[in-house]
Structure formats: structure tokens, C-alpha cells
């Protein structure tokens, strides 16, 4: 009897391996050292479905040279377990090696993109000792797609593999060498600070800094606006909109301020048809998710990937705005969606009337636009529901009718001065019925005709100022990076995330470049502008694309990049000490500024946040001449919100989640306390009244030997904590009173307040 052939399918993640195994047959789950894999039989063939866990291999130096040595270009691929926190990768490598020994043929079933091709190829090459395999390509994890991909396999795309390897190598070349160069510049002046800059992060931070400096240097320019408040709460604005000359504005105002009527001199009515919005590419999905739900681009990408792995949507990392051309494929999906309680009626009409979807301009050689493929069978999290709903509605709306809007522009005359008012309304909802997220202004004007007289209630003149350019948001920056050709659809969200993590940028609703970020860019711009030149980065991105399509060779691009970088680093080394001095000067100024809390009430000096081995406090910069000092708690992360207390005008600090006034004598902290002898229950010494940033409290007179404290209004004990034996006391939270352990935060036991306890309180 002939031996049964064994096929090994390598997936990107364990969850995808399970999906693929169950789609191909009745799979049996097994494991090697805790690593799951699946076995099944299909068409007389034994199939093993196993997985990687993302990238199993990473780049390191071939030889460990002295600490901080650069430039380094001699690198190799090794198991990713060398990275901290990635030790678990070894188990997956060993499992694939073991499973590959009995395999006769191999399939790669990782994500169909550059990273997926590289993950699969590396697993095949370094774990299985093979260079060739069949390639399963799919854009969704539905059973039908998986079976089709298995029965009609492709070959490995070595252009994608080369492009993937080249991207990782270039990122290593630039990231490691430039970061070491910066740190060595600081070491050259006998200082130390961890610094980093990357191939794409540098140019991205550079144009963010450019915008930040525009905002800092912006000088507001005054202008005047004249408006007429009309009957029925209508508001008309002078046709000039902005008066840049105050005298001219006031002359117009004086001329018409007492007028009580306006004459309609012109009416223009226009209708516009608004086509449905095209289906989502990743960048547009990220922007819309942030705009409507404030979900960050990085989180949107992660949620979309999870929805894809659960076979609810198609592959999310796509540039396409076009749905698949295969009508049968779309009809199969619509036949599933028509059973949905909300989307069903729309899917039914699309099927019944054979409606065709609109397309956007963007294309992707591998994947169609993001679209739904199934209905959730399990409960989704709130954010998953929002992203799924956004994609579902956008998919269905692409098939729908145009929306129709009517716009009314009216010109009125007030004593020879022309004013304008406008209205708009929706005539036909069309696709907006389904994808209702974009806001349509509905401004109804009363029926008006030429020569009508309208009552004027009031004329106003308002001085305004021009506003600085807006900062980018985490969503708008994705569009800007795409426009400038920096990064890829899969990496742009991560680029911004790294800039935030490194302290170069903060996200408080918009992206603000920190003083640290500005000082790094100013240093590089002055001494080594090539590092932050986006033309060089864009050129490399274009070459990576050419590698992908086999138009140029990988080695040629890497050799050219190495020569280019060596030249940059040679110049950098010549100026190393100057760069270090300039960078430290900027960093010291930044650090000093970051520690300033406010002004000293005694001498007018700066109040500075000081961290000392004996504790934390705020002290005057003019010490020892000025001895103003405010103690701070030992625990809790401190932030400086640049606010002052309404009651005493002292600076406010945010410690943990609480904003507090640093002044212990603040009127808001004063309490009336009866004089009474109190004894410390811990050591027997006398308890004395003390004042701190949180207000007055009792503390042991034997401090610092005894650190016992208790609040002035000590909470009444209502029982013993079943978890730690501490006292249970009545506390008050944002949802009302409850019983909690007095040993919080060490013990977080809580319970509901009983009725009799409420009555006693």
C-alpha cells in the first residue's frame, strides 16, 4: 500500500491556523511543547496546519563590537527569541522544524502582503530547510476562499520576499546606526541619554516640527466681521466676510447699525447629486474611525486585523478602493448579510435590483477594498462593533443611490451694503441613509423671493483674530504621510506610535511636538540634514516597490543605501562633539523648562519640581537665598498641567489621577479641628495636626521613625475585610457610596453599601 503524502501548511498566527484547518476538513487539534497544530485528511492526503507567531526571525550584528560602535552593516537573520519578551518564539520554531521532517510538500498560508510573504518564507527556509513551496493566497478567511486558495495554489512571490527583507535591512541600517550616532555625540561631551531616530520617523518628525514651529511663531492678525441678525433667527454676513481695515469696518457698521429692514436682491438655488463614498482602503478607514469614534489608527488596524482573522471582513491592509469584480462572490456575501436584522433590507434590495458598487481611484495588486464577508456569531466588544458597523455600512452604501442636496444662496441689501445668507437641505437621502456618519447641515430658510423685505433685529461688529495652522491629529497625519510617500499602509500608524512613545510627540487630541522632539530635529537640521530628508526616504520607498516587481535587484539597492549612509555617518563623526554640545544645550534647556511648575510667591523666581533620594518637592530656583518649599507625596506620577489654583493662585500639579494645589495653606484645604489629645495606635507617641498637598491630617510626632497617619474625619469602620483582614470603611466614589478596604490600594476589596449602613450614614 502506497504511503499517504503529508502536506504542511504554515500560517501566520495560531488563530488563523485553526480557521484554515477547520475550513479544509475535520481537524484534530494536537500540540508540541504547548504549541498547537492541526491534523486532517483531505483527498487522500494528510494535512498538518501549523503556524508562526508573526516574525520568527530578526536581524542582529554578526559580531558584537564595542558598545555603541557604528557604522554597522554586517548583519544576519537569527531567531526573534533574542529580543526581550520574545523567548516564546523558540517553541514555534522547534515545532515547525519537527513537523517539517515528515512533510512531502509545503504550503505558505500567511497574510498576502510583504510582511506575510517574508514571515512564510523565513519559516520555510530557516525552520523547514526549504526554498520553495506552494502559496495559498486569499483576501478573506471564509471557508470558500480558503478552499479555493488551497485547491488553486500559487508560487512564492520572491519579489515580495526581497522587498520585505530589504525593508527590514534598511530600517536596521538607518535605525541602529543613526541612533548610535546620536548617543555617541552625547557621550562625546561626557553625558548619557538614550536617543533614537529612524529612516521614516526622522522625516515624519521633521515635518511635524515644521508645523509646530509655524504655530509657535504665528502672530495673530486682527480682522472684523459684520453680521445682520434677521427675523426668525436668521444670520447674514457681510459679503466681504473679513474686514482687514478697522476704520473701513467701523464706517460700514456706523452706516447701517440702525437699519431695521433688508431687501432680497438675489436668490440662487442649486441642486447637487452626491455619489456614494467608495469602499474603504486602510488609510481612509483609520481616518473615519478616529473622526467618528476617536479610535486611534493603530488600534483601528489591530481591530480590523482581528475582525479579518474571525472571518468577518476582508483583509484590511489594502490600498484598494474597489470591491472584487466577481459578482458571484459579492452575491454570496449579500445572501449572508440579508439575514442581518439591520443590514438585511439593504442587502436584499442590492440583490433584487442587481445594483453595482461605486469604485474609488486607488488600487492594490493583491487585495480588494475592505468589505464585510459575514455576520458576527459571537458578541463583539464595543470598539469592534463600531469598526464592523463602519465597514458594513460603507460596503453596502457603495451599491446605493446618489444622495441629493439643495443649496440656497440669498443676497440681501442693507442701505447699499450687500450681505449673504445660505441654507441647505437634503432632498434625497440615498446612500446617506446607510452610511450616515458624514454630517449634512440642514439649514432651512423661510420661503423668499426677490424684492422681499426682511426685518433686521440687530447689526453687530466683532473683532476676531486669524488662527495659527492646525496641528495634525493621529488620523490626519496618516493622510499626510501617504501624500508625502512616507511609510506604507501597514507601518504609518506604528511610526506615529513610536514618536509618541519616545517622547518626541504628545497626543492630547492633536499631535504636539515636545521640546525634546524639536531639539532633536533642530540639531539634525543644523549638522546633518540628510538624515531627515524625506526625498531620500521617498526614493528608498520607490526602490522597494521596484524590488517587489523585480525591476531592480535587492543587493543593488542595499549597496547604494549603505554607501549613502556611510557618507552621512562619516560627516556626522567629524562633527560629533559639536553635535553633542548643541544637543545637550537644547536638552538641558528642555529639561529645565519641563521642571518649571510656576512662579515663586516670595521672590518671583521659578518654582522647580525636584526629585531627590529623600523624596520629591517643589522648591525655588533662587535657593538658598529663597527657602520656599512645598513637599509632595512619594508616590504617583507627576505631570505639570500649567494651571493655577482659583482660590490661592498657587501652581497645580497632577499627581496620579488627581489635580492638587501645591500650597498646604490654600483656603480650600482649611478645616476646623477641635484641640484634643490623640495617641498614635502604632507607637504610642502623640498625634499632631499636619498640613500637606492633600490638605490637613493627623501624623505621628515620632516621624520619620513612625509614619502613621490618619484623616481628620476618620471613616467609621463597618466590618473586617474578608480578603486581607483590614478594616472595611464607607467610601464615596463617582457612582455613590460603597464599602471598601482601608488598606487600599494594596487591597482593592469592595462591596455594595447595605441599606441599614446607608441609613446610619
From Swiss-Prot:
Query: Which InterPro entries would you find in this protein's record?
Result: Topo_IA, Topo_IA_2, Topo_IA_AS, Topo_IA_cen, Topo_IA_cen_sub1, Topo_IA_cen_sub2, Topo_IA_cen_sub3, Topo_IA_core_domain
Q: Identify the keywords attached in UniProt to this record, alphabetized.
A: DNA-binding, Isomerase, Magnesium, Metal-binding, Repeat, Topoisomerase, Zinc, Zinc-finger
Question: What ranges of residues constitute the C4-type zinc fingers?
Answer: 600-626, 680-706, 721-747
Organism superkingdom: Archaea
User: Which cofactors are reported in the record for this sequence?
Assistant: Mg(2+)
Which region ranges are annotated with the description Interaction with DNA? 196-201
Keyword set includes Zinc-finger: yes
- List its EC numbers: 5.6.2.1
One GO CC annotation: chromosome
Which residues carry out catalysis? 315
Q: Which GO terms describe its biological process?
A: DNA recombination; DNA repair; DNA topological change
Q: A GO molecular function for this record? A: zinc ion binding
Entries under PANTHER family matching the protein = DNA TOPOISOMERASE 1 (PTHR11390:SF26), PROKARYOTIC DNA TOPOISOMERASE (PTHR11390)
Alphabetical list of HAMAP family matching this protein? Topoisom_1_prok (MF_00952)
* Annotated function: Releases the supercoiling and torsional tension of DNA, which is introduced during the DNA replication and transcription, by transiently cleaving and rejoining one strand of the DNA duplex. Introduces a single-strand break via transesterification at a target site in duplex DNA. The scissile phosphodiester is attacked by the catalytic tyrosine of the enzyme, resulting in the formation of a DNA-(5'-phosphotyrosyl)-enzyme intermediate and the expulsion of a 3'-OH DNA strand. The free DNA strand then undergoes passage around the unbroken strand, thus removing DNA supercoils.
Protein family: Belongs to the type IA topoisomerase family.
> How would you summarize the oligomeric state and partners of this protein?
Monomer.
Q: What is this protein called?
A: DNA topoisomerase 1
- Which species is this UniProt entry from? Methanocaldococcus jannaschii (strain ATCC 43067 / DSM 2661 / JAL-1 / JCM 10045 / NBRC 100440) (Methanococcus jannaschii)
The lineage is: Archaea, Methanobacteriati, Methanobacteriota, Methanomada group, Methanococci
Amino acid at each position: 500500500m502506497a504511503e499517504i503524502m503529508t502536506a504542511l501548511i504554515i500560517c501566520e498566527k495560531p488563530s488563523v491556523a485553526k480557521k484554515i484547518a477547520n475550513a479544509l476538513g475535520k481537524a484534530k487539534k494536537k500540540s508540541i511543547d504547548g504549541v498547537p497544530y492541526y491534523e486532517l485528511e483531505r483527498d487522500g492526503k494528510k494535512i498538518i496546519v501549523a503556524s508562526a507567531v508573526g516574525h520568527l526571525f530578526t536581524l542582529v550584528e554578526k559580531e558584537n563590537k564595542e558598545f555603541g560602535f557604528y557604522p554597522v552593516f554586517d548583519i544576519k537573520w537569527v531567531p526573534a527569541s533574542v529580543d526581550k519578551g520574545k523567548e516564546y518564539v523558540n517553541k514555534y520554531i522547534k515545532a515547525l522544524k519537527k513537523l517539517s521532517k515528515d512533510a512531502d510538500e509545503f504550503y505558505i498560508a500567511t497574510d498576502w502582503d510583504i510582511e506575510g510573504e517574508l514571515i512564510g518564507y523565513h519559516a520555510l527556509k530557516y525552520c523547514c530547510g526549504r526554498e520553495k513551496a506552494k502559496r495559498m493566497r486569499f483576501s478573506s478567511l471564509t471557508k470558500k476562499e480558503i478552499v479555493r486558495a488551497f485547491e488553486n495554489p500559487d508560487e512564492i512571490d520572491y519579489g515580495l520576499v526581497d522587498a520585505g527583507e530589504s525593508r527590514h535591512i534598511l530600517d536596521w541600517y538607518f535605525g541602529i546606526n543613526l541612533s548610535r550616532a546620536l548617543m555617541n555625540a552625547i557621550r562625546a561631551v561626557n553625558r548619557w541619554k538614550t536617543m533614537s531616530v529612524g529612516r521614516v520617523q526622522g522625516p515624519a518628525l521633521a515635518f511635524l516640527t515644521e508645523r509646530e514651529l509655524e504655530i509657535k511663531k504665528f502672530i495673530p492678525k486682527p480682522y472684523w466681521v459684520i453680521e445682520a441678525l434677521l427675523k426668525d433667527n436668521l444670520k447674514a454676513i457681510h459679503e466681504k466676510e473679513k474686514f482687514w481695515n478697522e476704520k473701513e469696518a467701523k464706517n460700514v457698521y456706523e452706516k447701517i447699525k440702525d437699519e431695521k429692514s433688508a431687501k432680497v436682491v438675489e436668490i440662487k438655488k442649486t441642486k447637487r447629486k452626491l455619489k456614494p463614498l467608495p469602499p474603504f482602503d486602510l488609510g481612509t478607514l483609520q481616518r473615519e474611525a478616529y473622526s467618528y469614534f476617536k479610535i486611534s489608527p493603530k488600534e483601528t488596524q489591530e481591530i480590523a486585523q482581528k475582525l479579518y482573522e474571525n472571518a468577518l471582513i476582508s483583509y484590511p491592509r489594502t490600498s484598494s478602493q474597489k470591491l472584487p469584480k466577481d459578482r458571484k462572490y459579492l452575491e454570496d456575501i449579500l445572501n449572508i448579510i440579508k439575514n442581518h436584522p439591520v443590514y438585511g433590507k439593504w442587502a436584499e434590495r442590492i440583490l433584487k435590483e442587481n445594483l453595482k458598487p461605486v469604485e474609488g481611484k486607488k488600487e492594490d495588486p493583491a487585495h480588494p477594498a475592505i468589505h464585510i464577508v459575514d455576520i458576527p456569531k459571537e458578541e463583539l466588544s464595543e470598539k469592534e462593533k463600531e469598526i464592523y458597523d463602519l465597514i458594513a455600512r460603507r460596503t453596502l452604501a457603495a451599491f446605493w443611490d446618489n444622495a441629493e442636496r439643495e443649496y440656497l444662496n440669498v443676497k440681501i441689501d442693507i442701505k447699499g451694503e450687500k450681505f449673504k445668507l445660505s441654507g441647505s437641505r437634503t432632498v434625497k437621502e440615498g446612500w446617506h441613509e446607510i452610511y450616515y456618519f458624514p454630517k449634512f447641515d440642514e439649514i432651512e430658510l423661510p420661503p423668499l423671493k426677490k424684492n422681499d423685505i426682511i426685518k433686521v433685529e440687530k447689526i453687530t461688529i466683532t473683532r476676531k483674530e486669524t488662527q495659527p495652522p492646525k496641528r495634525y491629529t493621529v488620523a490626519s497625519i496618516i493622510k499626510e504621510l501617504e501624500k508625502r510617500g512616507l511609510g506604507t499602509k501597514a507601518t504609518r500608524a506604528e511610526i506615529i506610535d513610536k514618536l509618541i512613545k519616545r517622547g518626541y510627540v504628545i497626543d492630547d487630541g492633536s499631535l504636539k511636538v515636545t521640546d525634546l522632539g524639536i531639539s532633536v530635529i533642530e540639531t539634525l537640521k543644523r549638522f546633518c540634514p540628510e538624515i531627515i530628508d524625506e526625498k531620500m526616504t521617498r526614493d528608498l520607498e520607490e526602490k522597494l516597490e521596484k524590488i517587489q516587481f523585480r525591476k531592480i535587484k535587492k543587493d543593488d539597492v542595499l549597496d547604494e543605501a549603505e554607501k549613502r549612509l556611510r557618507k552621512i555617518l562619516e560627516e556626522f563623526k567629524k562633527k560629533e562633539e559639536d553635535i553633542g554640545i548643541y544637543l545637550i544645550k537644547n536638552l538641558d534647556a528642555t529639561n529645565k523648562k519641563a521642571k518649571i511648575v510656576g512662579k515663586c510667591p516670595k521672590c518671583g523666581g521659578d518654582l522647580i519640581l525636584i526629585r531627590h533620594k529623600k523624596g520629591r518637592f517643589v522648591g525655588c530656583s533662587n535657593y538658598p537665598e529663597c527657602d520656599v518649599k512645598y513637599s509632595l507625596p512619594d508616590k504617583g506620577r507627576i505631570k505639570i498641567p500649567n494651571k493655577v489654583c482659583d482660590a490661592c493662585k498657587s501652581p497645580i500639579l497632577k499627581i496620579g489621577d488627581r489635580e492638587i494645589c501645591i500650597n498646604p495653606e490654600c483656603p480650600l484645604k482649611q478645616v476646623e479641628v477641635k484641640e484634643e489629645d490623640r495617641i498614635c495606635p502604632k507607637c504610642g507617641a502623640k498625634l499632631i495636626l499636619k498640613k500637606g498637598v492633600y490638605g490637613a491630617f493627623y501624623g505621628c510626632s515620632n516621624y520619620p521613625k513612625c509614619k502613621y497617619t490618619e484623616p481628620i474625619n476618620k471613616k467609621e469602620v463597618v466590618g473586617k475585610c474578608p480578603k486581607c483582614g483590614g478594616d472595611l470603611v464607607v467610601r464615596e466614589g463617582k457612582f455613590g457610596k460603597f464599602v471598601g478596604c482601608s488598606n487600599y490600594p494594596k487591597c482593592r476589596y469592595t462591596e455594595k453599601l447595605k441599606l441599614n449602613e446607608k441609613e446610619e450614614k
